[in-house]
């Protein structure tokens, strides 16, 4: 039943409608025409307000302690996750800033060939809160436009791989560096002799050996650039071939077969990567010489073939270490499958055991010596220092030194065969020479045909202490950003790991001692 007030309102409305209907047609037309004009004006005002101020969701301010997200342009989560991971590496951002500054100083005209480095630098600085922006979501379509200028066919509506994009960016930056004018070097005699007064005469220089190699400024400063060593030893005569050096921008590690009841760790993947393998039917020059010396007639001896043992090591560790865990496998029918095993990793990573050392090199007995590399990021040490004592040496007694909370190097298998490993223990990072800190993790959810990339990364340091490293972690999925715990990060199924070189406690003490002197 309606209340008395509602009944009175209904009665008044009925009376007004009856009076309107009793009026003439001309009066009703004028009133309806005025209503149309009023409605049109109201609609125009509403549209103008929407155009000027926009919807409320577009004006969201970024919450304190978080970083901007990135809008998904179709299927660009692979790019968004990689950019968030790179922005969490201060050494890479600083190198980009120094590279663009040096390029601007050398160039006189417009910087038409520096699109990628400047675009990437502006994006990473905005994502690391170094640029003044209050927007909660940023647009990274400018990066795709620049990469298309480098003839990369990258569609924002097709699913791509974050690791492939990482190498696209590093190789494109190298192309940009190649277009940069070379810095005149003392050994570049030809450039130094290009003087006007020396035009009539041609000055030549004769040398018995090969010219001294000129330094490559970009490669020496590239934070993700490292070197692998390949060592081959004959099993018959034990002759060692010359060490071969290859460059890398990321370590792509296969995941070994898991043993039931024992977790897989990052150390297992690293050891599987450097494990020795036998290479059969290889010509050994030393065995051929020995066989030739043994003949009395001096007749020609056929090339002696033998089995070699090949092993990889890390010749030069970069400032920023990108580790790619290969989760692609193939079934017996040739179908691609994704491996979903959880690979345990820690916040800190010791790489001493995987570092290549010259034969006969003795580690320091007074602790490692830390040398500061000019131009490197704070707390990032890029000098080649001696490995810490105590790690297992070839032919040395096996000691129970545990790496990264996984297992002793002496207990790891010489060949990739499934064996039982001890339970994880707390590692000792204090005296490590090659110590890295986790900065970001890229995770892929889904299968080999479809999925989604998300990123765990450290929050940028505070403005009061910009050289510090934040302990607050963030979970980022395109434009969604929230806080996360370290335990959540370490429990994720990592696809890409971004580590950055830091000084251990012993190295920091050594640097402070030398500064006091």
Curated annotation (Swiss-Prot):
Ubiquitinated by parkin (PRKN) at Lys-235 and Lys-289, leading to its degradation. The keyword Transmembrane helix applies. Residues 1-35 are mitochondrial intermembrane. One of its GO terms (cellular component) is mitochondrion. It catalyses: Thiol-dependent hydrolysis of ester, thioester, amide, peptide and isopeptide bonds formed by the C-terminal Gly of ubiquitin (a 76-residue protein attached to proteins as an intracellular targeting signal). Residues 68-502 form the USP domain. PROSITE patterns: USP_1 (PS00972), USP_2 (PS00973), USP_3 (PS50235). Changing residue 234 to S: Does not affect binding to diterpenoid derivative 15-oxospiramilactone (S3) inhibitor. Keywords: Hydrolase, Isopeptide bond, Membrane, Mitochondrion, Mitochondrion outer membrane, Protease, Thiol protease, Transmembrane, Transmembrane helix, Ubl conjugation, Ubl conjugation pathway. Residues 57-517 are cytoplasmic. The active site is at residues 77, 452. There is a cross-link at residues 235, 289 (Glycyl lysine isopeptide (Lys-Gly) (interchain with G-Cter in ubiquitin)). InterPro entries: Papain-like_cys_pep_sf (IPR038765), Peptidase_C19 (IPR050164), Peptidase_C19_UCH (IPR001394), USP_CS (IPR018200), USP_dom (IPR028889). Its main location: mitochondrion. The chain crosses the membrane at residues 36-56. Changing residue 452 to A: Does not affect binding to diterpenoid derivative 15-oxospiramilactone (S3) inhibitor. Belongs to the peptidase C19 family. Deubiquitinating enzyme tethered to the mitochondrial outer membrane that acts as a key inhibitor of mitophagy by counteracting the action of parkin (PRKN): hydrolyzes ubiquitin attached by parkin on target proteins, such as RHOT1/MIRO1 and TOMM20, thereby blocking parkin's ability to drive mitophagy. Preferentially cleaves 'Lys-6'- and 'Lys-11'-linked polyubiquitin chains, 2 types of linkage that participate in mitophagic signaling. Does not cleave efficiently polyubiquitin phosphorylated at 'Ser-65'. This is Ubiquitin carboxyl-terminal hydrolase 30. It comes from Mus musculus.
